[in-house]
């Protein structure tokens, strides 16, 4: 209660206790839909019209050294090289993400912006409650890539509004934050108006 920027988040968490948690169907139905509509990495690259690019080896080696010393309960890397390829090939400059953890996806995006010598990434990450992991958020991002990066340590409700106030449009939005229906609904409806026909969510 001593952190006013988190009040809206706490109020929304309380409201969700009284909402339908699965308005799109049961968890089993939702999972079945996902399996029925999944695709391969190669197909996704084809749909996006991009080739595969790799993050520079020295960045990867540095990130791995940090990853090995980070707490184990912060999640994995995901397909950060797909994000890297997307930004590099499409020459995106206005990038946004919510959910950072150790920062592998952040690294992929920032390494592409560094190659392009253009653009900015605004990341939003709410510190893990009571886990004392704040100092590890973004730990896999080398200091040399920080010049194109703004990290907002806020809940999505505060952070997204602040981030979007800095962009006239958004080229890429990488969403790896609140996985609930209502969390996604809030973020999607806030960000979509800032996206254009060539944007990727």
PLM regions: where:
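Membrane-proximal basic amphipathic "stem/tether" segments
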Residues: 1-56, 60-61
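Short, isolated positions within intrinsically disordered regulatory regions of eukaryotic proteins
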Residues: 10-14, 18, 37-39, 51, ...
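Conserved Class I S-adenosyl-L-methionine-dependent methyltransferase catalytic core
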Residues: 46-68, 73-86
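S-adenosylmethionine/decaboxylated-SAM
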Residues: 69-201
